[in-house]
Amino acid sequence: MKNLLSVVKISVPDQVYLKDPETSDLGKRIIENSILLIDELGFDSFTFKKLGTKIGSNESSIYRYFESKHKLLLYLSSWYWAWLEYQLVVETFSLSNPKEKLNKAVAIVTNTVAFDRNFSHINEVVLYKIIVNESSKSFLTKEVDSENKEGYFEIYKRLITRLSDMMLAINPNFAFSLSLASTVLEGGLHQHFLQAHFPSITNCKNDKTPTDFFLDLIENALK
């Protein structure tokens, strides 16, 4: 898998950027440092002016890649979901047992993230913190319906569909596979958020993980 990942380019919908940041050193520095700066300041306090100062480039140069910080957040979110989807596909491809395949997939999408050396300009551990804390801001907007029609969220929705299909492979009569799959994907983030900020209102602590919770939930739902 490591050798395969090293030659793979994670694809992001081209609607979210003006120029592909992966095509230049400046673009990669924009992505690398935007992740670090959003984590440091929070998305609301993050600006292209501050990012320009951090990377030693004019603010206007960043606007050649992204028309707004909203589009940048959409890019980061899409990159994360595409990276996660690729891991899911590779790790489950050879598994023939439907339950084993689903359990593996759930573990991948609900576990904490480890650093991936295949993408040196992207710190996936820090990016994951942004996804947990900030990614909902990419779609909780007035423009969500139009952006959805334009394909901004295709990777996110495709990942949910993959989980749903795995559930139906176990129980074809289960009527709520998409609802459960989307709950797993978003709920995994939410449980990690609760662990970090509101530990008194989650059972996912000590030796119990969000993965344990969702595996138990799915097993009971698919009976």
Give the label of every model feature segment.
Residues 1-11, 21, 124-129, 134-140:
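Intrinsic, short, N-terminal disordered tails of RNA polymerase sigma-factor systems
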Residues 100, 127-169:
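Amphipathic alpha-helical packing segments from all-alpha helical-bundle domains
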Residues 83, 87, 116, 134, ...:
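A short secondary-structure junction motif
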Residues 32, 36, 72-93, 104, ...:
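Alpha-helical structural segments
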Residues 17, 22-47:
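Short, amphipathic alpha-helix enriched in basic
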Residues 1-11, 157, 161-172, 182-223:
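C-terminal peripheral helix-coil segments that are non-catalytic and often amphipathic
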